[in-house]
Amino acid sequence: MILRRRGIVLSFHSNMVTVEDEETGERLLCKLRGKFRLQNLKIYVGDRVEYTPDGTGSGVIENVLHRKNLLVKPHVANVDQAILVVTVKMPETSTYIIDKFLVLTEKNELETVLVINKMDIYDEEDLEKVKELERIYSKLYPIVKTSAKTGMGIEELKKYLKGKISTMAGLSGVGKSSLLNAINPGLKLRVSEVSQKLQRGRHTTTSAQLLRFDFGGYVVDTPGFANLEIGDIEPEELKYYFKEFNEKQCFFSDCNHIDEPECGVKEAVENGEIAESRYENYVKMFHELLGRGKS
């Protein structure tokens, strides 16, 4: 009798699933048991599964084990943390994009590391932009400054990645694949050139896949994003995902920090305790979500 084993889903190939055995590290191409189709059961990259090996390097997935979380875009299960890779040019990542991403990671209760990449190409003006990002975010999230070309920050970033399942995201062209190759050269990911006209890279990743680091841990390399959807968040819920807002006392317990009097958040913005860009981006998102409700 062949005993069931446990593994983790790395990627999909048509109707087949690549599974890595959690004990041996062996990779098998597995089919799904018929009940998945009959019961419309879903399976995602990052899922921990029970499977039955057939002894020839293949197997059949029997069950999906309990998920601690499931990200929607991209669909990834059991993620421990998010790594947001940003650049201040070629392309420039706006604080609005950063804050939208952070709203999503806060909503999904993920630890987040902000990586400022391409440090080797920045002039004095660019370095001032880097300092501004540090001023805005360093008290809220860990920041690692990196260069895949010079190796700057690579060892520091490895410490955050070791032993965890991380999702890495960022605008196309910020250098995610180059960073991953610098962190773990054995990955040999394809790297794109950045278009000077659009200042965006060509997408080198077309679907989510789980990549294993030699030093332990996994990363989900996902397609670059240009638009982040926060449409399933209620306007009144948004404030909870700007975590520095939660420390402030307002006169009204249900204050949305927009037009209400005696608002602790607005006072903190005026006093310089909360970054103006964070508050402006919050207000913009709040009105976007309100407008969605009226359409």
From Swiss-Prot:
Chain positions recorded as Zn(2+) binding sites: C250, C255, H257, C263
Coiled-coil stretches: none
Main localization (coarse): cytoplasm
Cofactor details (free text): Binds 1 zinc ion per subunit.
EC number: 3.6.1.-
Cellular compartments per GO CC: cytoplasm
Compartments where located: Cytoplasm
NCBIfam families for the chain: ribosome small subunit-dependent GTPase A (TIGR00157)
Subunit-structure text: Monomer. Associates with 30S ribosomal subunit, binds 16S rRNA.
Homology family: Belongs to the TRAFAC class YlqF/YawG GTPase family. RsgA subfamily.
Protein name per UniProt: Small ribosomal subunit biogenesis GTPase RsgA
Species this protein is from: Thermotoga neapolitana (strain ATCC 49049 / DSM 4359 / NBRC 107923 / NS-E)
